[in-house]
Amino acid sequence: MEKKMLTEVFYLHEKGSLADARLCTYILDDSDSIAIEKRPMMLICPGGGYEHTSDREAEPLAMHFLSIGYHVAVLRYSVAPAVYPTALLEATASMKLIHEHAKEWYVDTDKIVVQGSSAGGHLAACLAMFWHTKWLAEMAGVTNDILKPAAMLLNYPVVTSGEYAHRGSFKQLLGGNETEELLELLSLEKQVTEHTPPAFIWHTYTDQSVPVQNSLLLIGAMKKYEIPVEFHMYPVGKHGLSTCSRLTAMRDGTGIQKECGSWLPLAKRWLIALRDE
């Protein structure tokens, strides 16, 4: 019997979800010819300033992670006019769905990595920061272990609501309800705890949209808890580079920064080490 990669689309119906909120899964086959019983899973959260989810940071990255032996799920989460916590609840629903299908899909549930770019990095990091909390488990209707990611992989992430904030992301995420309490909660460098998972993070020094200080603040907070971080800062590059190659070039020809593309093999090495622990 011929076996093929399994692709499915699961529509998500959390409180406040938009009609097109969905999880797109790419599941590698379980061939008898390959000595792998279970595979790790990558949950991808594309960027887009909480206004849209970027095609450039979705399937192209999924194909890369599939090529190194990860199952992949791309979360097309709800964006404005949907507001917090809708996207976060869709991320928790995605984790629940992955666990429910773990046996069928041959997923190693101890090796689920959450990945995000830009505002998607903020969503991915929200899950990584809050997975252990009572309030999130109650909102999601699951136990905390279902929500736990093994690690987070962040591309030029939105992190802080403070001095170096990407204001547009927080405006869209909160829909104008930018209370001091919510801004404090969602300034993720302030939410790091001993429960925060290890991270691989990269950013460019010249990012004019999401300043590199976003990553630096998060790394500094993680260092206080001695949580492992691999960080790469490239001297030149605009925001939103994704693969940094023609594969994800913008229609105007920008978005190619070959020297930044080394993040892909560096992340591969990091992910393989994580997988083999």
Q: Where does each model-flagged region fall?
A:
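N-terminal cap/lid segment of alpha/beta-hydrolase-fold proteins
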Residues: M1-E37, Q257-C260
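Short beta-strand element of the alpha/beta-hydrolase
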Residues: K38-G47
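Catalytic nucleophile-loop/oxyanion-hole region of alpha/beta-hydrolase
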Residues: T53-D55, P60, A73-T109, Q257-E259
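Primarily recognizes the serine-hydrolase "nucleophile elbow" in alpha/beta-hydrolase
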Residues: K96-H166, T179, L183
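Short beta-strand/loop motif that positions the catalytic acidic residue
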Residues: H195, I201-H203, D207
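Acidic beta-to-alpha connecting loop that harbors the catalytic carboxylate
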Residues: Y205-Q208, V236-K238
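Conserved alpha/beta-hydrolase "acid-adjacent" motif
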Residues: Q208-L217, S242
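C-terminal catalytic histidine-bearing segment of alpha/beta-hydrolase fold enzymes
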Residues: I219-E277
